[in-house]
């Protein structure tokens, strides 16, 4: 049996309920719908960590986060840790990454042959292997220099993240159209930042959803007062504790 080519498309912080594929009445995700109709969907699939990097490292290795020491977004994966990229290369695949996989530290491939488009998170690391802007919680709750933008900055526009995602798409298509792709089986991991914050999108997409048609989340009485202390400290760190109620 011929070995199949594999195109792995990833989006970031994309909850399934925010897609027409999983029944959202307003959002339009036609290409996801097409993939689902022509393939299979899964209703009981879970990531192994609520944090970005640990979840991705578990996905890359097939191991629990406690087995690989990935507990936060500043945990480099040891270069000698085997990933599925290593395993597929070992059986003759060309294994290519285009975009984000949230590797931190000097090794930005972890088994991939090459990376076609940049990962912004790789640029957060200093030359001595430290994450820029890492908070020292041992000295108490760090204070934000300014309130985190979050929803307050949401709207139409462009960002570096959008430009990088456009490059991920462009380089991925170039790779797939390259005749040399037919020389050996390939795996292409096209990994996008969106819909991860900043919550800014090109105007043509923003205009698809009139604000008066978007339901606001239901917030129970006493929600802020009854938050877990960890959540309260996070609100303080992001400078969100003093937001007025309408925000």
Question: Where are the regions a protein language model picked out?
Answer:
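Formylglycine-dependent sulfatase
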Residues: 1-247
């Amino acid at each position: 049996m011929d070995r199949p080519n594999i195109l792995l498309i990833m989006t970031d912080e994309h909850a399934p309920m925010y897609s027409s594929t999983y029944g959202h009445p307003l959002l339009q995700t036609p290409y996801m719908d097409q993939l689902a109709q022509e393939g299979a969907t899964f209703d009981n699939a879970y990531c192994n960590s609520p944090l970005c990097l640990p979840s991705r490292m578990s996905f890359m290795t097939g191991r629990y986060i406690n087995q690989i020491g990935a507990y936060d977004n500043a945990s480099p994966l040891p270069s000698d840790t085997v990933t599925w990229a290593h395993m597929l290369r070992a059986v003759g695949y060309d294994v290519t990454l285009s975009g984000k996989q949230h590797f931190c530290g000097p090794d930005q491939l972890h088994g991939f042959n090459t990376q076609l488009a940049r990962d912004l998170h790789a640029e957060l690391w200093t030359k001595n292997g430290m994450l820029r802007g890492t908070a020292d919680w041992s000295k108490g709750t760090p204070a934000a220099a300014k309130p985190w933008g979050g929803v307050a900055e949401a709207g139409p526009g462009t960002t570096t993240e959008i430009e990088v995602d456009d490059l991920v798409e462009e380089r991925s298509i170039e790779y797939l159209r390259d005749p040399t792709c037919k020389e050996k089986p390939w795996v292409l991991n096209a990994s996008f930042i969106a819909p991860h914050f900043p919550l800014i999108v090109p105007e043509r997409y923003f205009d698809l959803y009139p604000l008066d048609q978007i339901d606001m989340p239901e917030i129970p009485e006493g929600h802020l007062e009854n938050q877990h202390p960890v959540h309260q400290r996070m609100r303080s760190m992001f400078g969100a504790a003093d937001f007025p109620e309408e925000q």
